[in-house]
Structure formats: C-alpha cells, structure tokens
Amino acid sequence: MIYTDAGVDEDKATIRPNQTHQFQKVQDEAKEWTKNKFLEFLNNFKLKKKIDKNNNNNNNEDNEDNNENENEYDENGIKKEKIDKSYYRQQVERMIKNDKSSLYIDFLHLEKFDKGLGKALLMEYFRLEPAIRQGLSIFIQKYFPSFMERVNKERIVLSICCYNVSTFVHIRELRSSRIGSLCSISGTVTRTSEVRPELVIGSFICKDCNTSSLPIAQQFKYTEPTKCLNPLCSNQRRWKINLEESTFTDWQKVRVQENNSEIPGGSVPRSLEIILRGDSVETARAGDTCTFVGTMNVIPDVSKMSIGNNAQIIKGVASSTKEGSNANGKDDFGGVGGLKDLGVREMNYRVCFFSQSVRSNVSTLSSINRKESGDNHGGHSHSVGIIDEDLEPESKESFLDSLPKKEKDSLKKMIKSKKIYQNLVNSICPSIFGHEEIKRGVLLMLFGGVHKKTPEKIRLRGDINVCIVGDPSTSKSTFLKYLVSFLPRTVYTSGKASSAAGLTATVVKDQESGDFNIEAGALMLADNGICCIDEFDKMEPGDQVAIHEAMEQQTISIAKAGIHASLNARTSILAAANPIGGRYDRNKTLKQNLNIGGPLMSRFDLFFVVLDECNPESDHRIAEHIVLTHQKREKAFNAPFSATEIKNYIKYTKFICPTIPDESVQLLVGHYDRLRQMDTSGSKTPAYRITVRQLESLVRLSESLARLHLDTKVLPKYVNEAARLLEKSIVHVETNDVILGDDDDDLVKNVENDNDNHAEEDGDDGIGKLTMNFSKYSQLSKLLVLQIKQSGKEKSGIKQIDLIDWYIKDQLESGIITDDEVTKETKITKMVINKMINKDNSLVVLVPNQYPDHRILIIHPNYSFDK
C-alpha cells in the first residue's frame, strides 16, 4: 500500500516533534492567501441562471419558467439552484445528506470567481491542498457545526474534489514538470485492487515509557516518530501504533491504460497507476473509460526501501562480498553514481497519479444491456454522481428531460416514426452496401432481450450473440469496427492473437503487496457492452472452450492462486469467422465449413453466411458505392439517423421490458416444433442441431423486436419476424447441387429433389454431369451409413451390392419409386457410394474387388453423424 499525507492539516500533525524546544512556526503566506480566497469563494459564489439566447427579448413569466425548466441541469449533470443562497453551501448540505465526506468543486466556477486563485491551484495544487481543506473545515464549522463535531469525533477525513479542469494531459505526456500541478487524464481502467484502509495520521506509543507521540502525517510510506517526547527516554525505533487515536481513510489502486486514439503509430499503450481515496473508491470498474483529475507525484519505492540496510540495490551483485562495500556490510552508494551505474542501479522512486475525482466518459445508461429487475442499474455511481445521486434517470420521461433540447426533439421524432425498424436498419453501418439481413441481426443485438432470473436465482441471459461467416472482403470486420467506433464498453479483439486468459480473466501478482489480483480480459471489460471477436475460427480449441460459460451463463469462474470467484461477463458477442480453406464451400454444411465446435455454435443466436459471388449488376452497384465513399466520405451516406440518435433511442428503449402474451407463447412453441421436425425429417437440412437454445433465441429476438418498436408486449408479428431471421440463419444453407459423376448411359442429367424423385433430361446431347440436390444427397448418404451401422457389420463390412439391394427394396416397399425407376435409382446409388468413398471419406473399402459391386465397405473411423 502507498501511504500519503492526504487529509492532514498542518496544525494537527507534526512530522518532527521536538522534545524541549518550541520553535516559532513560519507561516506560508501563499497558503494563507489561498485559504482566505477559497473561503471567500465558498461563501460568496452563486450560480446564475442561464437564459436561452432565443428568448432574450421575451421577459414574460412563462418564458422565464420555460427557461428554468429547460436548464434545470447544467452541462456537468448538476442540478442548478436559485441564487438566493451560496451554491456550495447547498452542495455541502447535499454532501452531509448523502453521508459523504468529499465536496466536489467545478473548477470553471473557481476560475470565473478568481482567476488568480485558479491559476495558483493549477500550478501548485499539491502544496496548496492543505490550505483549501482548512478553508473547507472553517466553512463547515461556521454553517454546520454539528457535522463538524461528528467529523472530529469519528476522525472523518474531509476532501475537496475538482472536476472540469481545463488542463488535460495524455498519459505519455506526464513529465517531471507536471509534478504537484493539477491536471486531468483519461484512460481505460484495466485493473482495480480491493479497497483497503490507509493510515493518514498516525498516533504512536513508545514501547519503553508508554508516552504518546504527536500526530504523525504519513509521507507516502509508514512513518514513525524520530524520537520519544519523554526527556528521560532515548527511544527512537521501538513504537506501537495507537489505532484509537489514528486516522484512516479508504484507499484503492487502479491501473489505467491510455486510450487507443491517443497511441502514436508504432507504439505500445502506456499504463499508469492511479490512487483513489475516500468517496472516489469503487467508482471505476475494469473496462470503464474515465477521466481522472488529480496531481502527479513521485513516491519512494517502498518495496525497495523496506528490505533493510543490506538491500541489494545492484542486480546480481552481493552487497557484502564485492569491492566497494564497507566493513560493516553496507554499500557505500552516494547520490552520484556516474556513467558506470547507468541502467544498473534500481530506481528508488516511481511516478504515481493521485486522483481526487473520477468521471466516466459515458453515462451508465449507455450500457447496452439492462440488468435483471432488482439489480442496481449501472452498477456504480455515475461520473461525479456523488454530488447528487438523484440525477440518474429512472424512467423514460426522466431520461428525455435529461437530454439537450436538440437531442430530445430528434428522439421524439424517432419515437413517432412509423417505419422505425427499416430506418434503423438503413442507419446501421451505412458505409456497407447491402447486407440488410446482417444489419437486422446486429440491430436486434444492440437492443437485446430481457434479462431474467428463475426462482432458483439462475440467470437467463437476454443478450444476443451473432456470428458472421463468409468469404474474404465481404465487410465482416467492418461491422465489428463500426460498433467499436460509437458504442460504449465495446471491446475489439482478434481470436488468433487472444488467449483464453486474455478473453476471460487472469490472476496477476501485485509487485508491491505480493497479493494476487484478478486482471480483466476482453469479456470482462465488455461487461454490459459488446465484445467483437474477429477471426473467431482461428482460436485454439482450448481457448474456444474457455468462453462457453461466458456466452451462456454470462459469468467467468476462476480458481487460481487461492482465488475462487465468479465474475460477471454480461456481454453480447459479435464474431466474424472465415470458412475452412478461405472460401465457403457450398457443397458442405455450415458446420463443415467452420472450425468451430457444436457446443459453441449452439450458443450463437444468429448465423449469417456471406458469399462473394460474381454478379455484374451487384458488382457494379458495390463498386459505385465504394467509389462514392472515397470521393464524398460522410456525404456519400444518406442515413436516416445519426449515431448519436441511435444511441439515445437504444438508451430510451432500455426502460421497456416487454412481456409475452398467451397467443405469442403458442406461436413460439409452434415455430420451435417445426424447427425440430426439420432437424429429424430431413426435408430441410439445418446448419446444426436444433436444441432448446434455439427456442430461447426465438424468445430473445422477439423481445428485442418488441423493445425496438416500444411495445410492452411481444406481439405475434414480432415472433414471426424472429422466426424468419432464425430460419434464414440456421435452416437456409448456401449449397450447390452435388456433382456425382459423368453419365454415359443417357440416363439422368439432373436429379431433382421432387416428390417422385424422377430424373429429368437436361440437354439434347445425352452427355453431361449427373448432379443431385444437396439435401437429397445428404439424406441418402446418412441412410446408407446408418444401415451399415444397424446391420451389425461395422467391423466386418458389407458388400456394396447388398447395401444397394437393401436401399432399392426399401424404396420400392415405401412406394417412393416404381419398377421402371429401379435401374435409374441403382445407378444413382452407385454414384453416391463412389462419392462417399472418394470425396467425402465417409466410407472405406475394406476388401477391394475387380467388380465394384462385390467390394466390402465399412464406415470411416472419423465419420460423424452430426456433420
């Protein structure tokens, strides 16, 4: 832990107490001036009303009331007050009412009140901070004496937190010139420690004579008195801390990584440790992009300094055996090491940022997923929402009121729009031409279903997972990048470059304390957001298994290094995958084209197959769209809604939790029964097995459509649209007819999958390729394999002629074919068997024969019925 002097008044704490002599204390004139000016600011600053420029000439009472209502909240999210009382006196009242100890100061107010005071605090905030805290104590003592008595009795540390600081610095721009000055930085939180107590002012007892020391301010590390106050005691090292008389505050350390937009080309992102105290702890979570306001300081590296006198400062060199060591075993290292120690001597100081206030760059309502009923919305206090916790919108009306007038008007137009579904589809990723079905799926993923909990407290996810499969250069990755560009808590990662720990979470050891902490992975960082995974098929099988739990249960379980935890990963997953071999083979099913296991495929609600087909008309339109994009850029798109309008509409719909009426329940059950019948009958070959998860997908998609249309009930039309999307995703497989071989007997040119299975001639020459519908071929091949398995001759094998005779006899008895069609069906069956042996590797010739009909066939050891 890092100990600091936060919350210490110089009148109450002394660093070096003297035994006998009392020296006259020298007053810092700058601190005295700052204290008086800040006290004057707290007493006299009043927030003036803002008047709409358009209504400057209207002085009637109605216009004044309208202006007051429209500007009830300022741009900082703070409710504006009337000017009959000091603004910050009211803020102190709120602070006391909310049981907080931090007063939030808008730095713009301070600079407006006194530019000299603002400039002084910007330049030397670390030096002047005790003075403004003294001013706050005097202010509270004057107006709220009862609260001040409680502060003194309970040893509460009062603090001042500034926001809206004009000086913004990038993480990699922090230099020694910034030490002690006030500035704000922005970054993404990657790791948070647990909240611990921090010793601010320590009171110690001498172990020799039991004399109490004066309060000792902790200077970045555990600091004890230099000498006992008892003149008859010579103790300088043996001390016992007096916990009852000491002052503690909450402390938390977070690691922040600079934003992607701030990283120069060819550079890796920089990280910085930030210390939070008091009311600021637990306001930043892993994955949040926040703005921190505070001061940069250099602190002693306690882990290096606390080892002892024989600390090994030079790597690989024993302190007492080499030349240059004193006789007593201590290294004689001076302040100047020279060029020989460059890169060898350990640094005893390091940079740390002490933050006063934390403000999320996006409101908690921007989260894509709304929690189950009963959960706290957002999970943590909003921005500097400690000022007024009532500002968090709790209904559609309050959310509308919190928007600026221009955004409110545009949102009201969207609410009244009759073609909102199609307009939103046209507004999603306008730089991509076509792909309307994919845009519909992505749009429904943004709105999501309703999170639920069973009576057994089992969570039922409402997030929708989508996977886009297709040929290269079909704009798969563009959809992922588009969502990352404007949605909050959206994380982009690549499957090939990500490990299981990088996607879920890992346990790391704190170098200072030695404790093990959990560091969030991509799925944890995207909690209440979207995780975009590119090259999903390139993930290792072990890494794919790691995200099974996160995709269905939406949790990540960790049991490492003595840590047993179940972490939230309530995120939607948008994945992009390439087919095996780089191109989608239409003669194979979706599962055969993807390097993804069946359990993982069933966790996706929607699959979309995108093919790069040569079509002169579509190619011309796509090329024209791309050229216009390069020529006119943003002006080339004519999207009905902007990204900001889409985000506001999504936030607005999150307050709606649609329910399912009885008529929709029966319709959902009917659609599910039909999908299961397709899976077993073979009339249409599904892309993968239909399970109960597909029924839950239907429910989620229907709820998302109802939420999109602002309906509180899931109407049958929403269920039908959800079923259409799901069937297009899992039943409609992009396949060509299967080529069986050459037809030399003028028997068949094209085998159609009609009711009678009759062959038709295609062409007049009588010579061509024999083709078969893919669904018919798949059904026939599975039937032949199943017969070999059920005959009990899996190991010994079966003659090809016996297998064909069984199939023809079965077709005749079932009335599927007639006696006139036996010769044609026999030839087709022989060609299917040849393809199963030579192409599909589903059958193996165990005993060859010069006559193909008499060879012995067995099932290939690697054959799977689920293919």
From Swiss-Prot:
It comes from the Eukaryota. GO terms for cellular component: MCM complex; nucleus. InterPro entries: MCM (IPR031327), MCM6 (IPR008049), Mcm6_C (IPR041024), MCM_CS (IPR018525), MCM_dom (IPR001208), MCM_lid (IPR041562), MCM_N (IPR027925), MCM_OB (IPR033762). Its EC number is 3.6.4.12. The lineage of its organism: Eukaryota, Amoebozoa, Evosea, Eumycetozoa, Dictyostelia. Pfam families: MCM, MCM6_C, MCM_lid, MCM_N, MCM_OB. ADP binds at R693, E696. Early fractionation of eukaryotic MCM proteins yielded a variety of dimeric, trimeric and tetrameric complexes with unclear biological significance. Specifically a MCM467 subcomplex is shown to have in vitro helicase activity which is inhibited by the MCM2 subunit. The MCM2-7 hexamer is the proposed physiological active complex. It comes from Dictyostelium discoideum. Residues 51-76 are annotated as: Disordered. The keyword NAD does not apply. Residues 420-626 form the MCM domain. Transmembrane segments: none annotated. Residues 61-75 have a biased composition (Acidic residues). It is found in: Nucleus. A motif (Arginine finger) lies at residues 602-605. PANTHER family: DNA REPLICATION LICENSING FACTOR MCM FAMILY MEMBER, DNA REPLICATION LICENSING FACTOR MCM6. CDD domains: MCM6. One of its GO terms (biological process) is double-strand break repair via break-induced replication. This is DNA replication licensing factor mcm6. Acts as a component of the MCM2-7 complex (MCM complex) which is the replicative helicase essential for 'once per cell cycle' DNA replication initiation and elongation in eukaryotic cells. Core component of CDC45-MCM-GINS (CMG) helicase, the molecular machine that unwinds template DNA during replication, and around which the replisome is built. Component of the MCM2-7 complex. The complex forms a toroidal hexameric ring with the proposed subunit order MCM2-MCM6-MCM4-MCM7-MCM3-MCM5 (By simililarity). Belongs to the MCM family. Disulfide bonds: none annotated.
